[in-house]
UniProtKB/Swiss-Prot annotation:
Gene responsible for this protein: rpsD
Gene3D superfamilies: Ribosomal Protein S4 Delta 41, Chain A, domain 1 (1.10.1050.10), RNA-binding S4 domain (3.10.290.10)
Protein's name in the database: Small ribosomal subunit protein uS4
PROSITE patterns cross-referenced by the UniProt entry: RIBOSOMAL_S4, S4
Oligomeric and partner information: Part of the 30S ribosomal subunit. Contacts protein S5. The interaction surface between S4 and S5 is involved in control of translational fidelity.
GO cellular component labels: small ribosomal subunit
UniProt feature coiled coil, ranges: none
Amino acid sequence: MAKYLGPKLKLSRREGTDLFLKSGIRAIDSKCKLDQPPGQHNMRKSRFSDYGIQLREKQKVRRIYGILERQFSNYYKRAARIKGNTGENLLKLLESRLDNTVYRMGFGATRAEARQLVSHKSIMVENRIVNIASYQVVPNTVIKIHKKSHKQSRIRASLELSEQQREKLAWIEVDPIKLQGLFKRYPERSELSANIDEHLIIELYSK
C-alpha cells in the first residue's frame, strides 16, 4: 500500500476521531466535523459489519503511527511472538519506535515532523546518529537533538507548545535546555490512549 499524501484532516474525519496527523499537540479545530465522514454531505452513515469495525480500528491505529500495511502486519507478528498480552505488546512496539519517541518527547509537533527529524539525521541515540524511523528504542535510552539542529526554530517551538499543552508522560523524561530526553521504560496500557481498542485488531488478525 502506497503512502497517503492527501489532506490529513480527511483521514481524521474518515476515522471519526483526531489522529493528530496535522494538529500534533493541539486538538483539531471545532470547525472540522469529525462526526461527518469525508465526501458528499447529508449521506446516511453506513453500518459496519464486525469485520468492518475491526478493519477501521486497524486503519485508525496504523494512521496514527504513520505505518504502512505490511509494516503493521509485521508488528502484529512480532507482538504475537512476545510473551504476554499481544494487544499490549503491539502498542508497546509502536510506542517505542524512534519517530514516535521523538514525538512523545516534544521535539516534533506531529509524528510526521518527528519522522522527518529522524530521516534528516537530526536525532542521536546514545550519542550515535540514527536515521531509521522504525528503530526500536529500549528502556534507559538517551535521545538527543544533534548539535547541528539545535538552532531549528520548529524544534524549540514544538517543545514550548509541548510544555504548555501536552500531558506529562511518566515513561519519558525531557530536558528542554539540553534538547535531550530519556526513554525510561515502556508505557503501561493504562497510560496510553483509551481511544484505541487493540482487541479489535487482534481479532482481525486472528481470523
